């Protein structure tokens, strides 16, 4: 059996993916992959996702330069979630989020409201031209 056949794809042929920084354990982002994206990620050693809004493959960093080198690809116990252990690269290393932050998970629920916990490391307007 092909390793991709062991993945439990959803009804749209997608699987949720979490990117985790290998060195710190920080959760950087959540995205989706289709079969082709997962195959390309394994082949290239760089994260390639499937953009549901664009309806196409999205090589992380193709516009921003913030590539992700993939060290491990893991599948959870139900075969329906992928975990990528990555090193976040780029002109400004450590920026994974399109908002210019280290992580996409920068909102913290505290005392009945969402609080921004991470600074913008670089203005997204200067990243995406």
Curated annotation (Swiss-Prot):
Reactions it catalyzes: 1-(5-phospho-beta-D-ribosyl)-5'-AMP + H2O = 1-(5-phospho-beta-D-ribosyl)-5-[(5-phospho-beta-D-ribosylamino)methylideneamino]imidazole-4-carboxamide
Family (UniProt): Belongs to the PRA-CH family.
EC number assigned by the record: 3.5.4.19
UniProt entry keywords in alphabetical sequence: Amino-acid biosynthesis, Cytoplasm, Histidine biosynthesis, Hydrolase, Magnesium, Metal-binding, Zinc
Classification via Pfam families: PRA-CH
UniProt-listed HAMAP family: HisI
Subcellular locations according to the entry: Cytoplasm
Positions annotated to bind Mg(2+): 76, 78, 80
Cofactors demanded by this protein: Mg(2+); Zn(2+)
Pathway: Amino-acid biosynthesis; L-histidine biosynthesis; L-histidine from 5-phospho-alpha-D-ribose 1-diphosphate: step 3/9
Annotated coiled-coil segments of the chain: none
Record InterPro entries: PRA-CH (IPR026660), PRib_AMP_CycHydrolase_dom (IPR002496), PRib_AMP_CycHydrolase_sf (IPR038019)
Biological process terms in GO annotation: L-histidine biosynthetic process
Subunit-structure text: Homodimer.
GO annotations of cellular component type: cytoplasm
Chief location bin: cytoplasm
Gene Ontology molecular-function annotations: magnesium ion binding; phosphoribosyl-AMP cyclohydrolase activity; zinc ion binding
Binding site for Zn(2+): 77, 97, 104
Protein name (record): Phosphoribosyl-AMP cyclohydrolase
Function: Catalyzes the hydrolysis of the adenine ring of phosphoribosyl-AMP.
Source species, domain of life: Bacteria
Cofactor note: Binds 1 Mg(2+) ion per subunit. Binds 1 zinc ion per subunit.
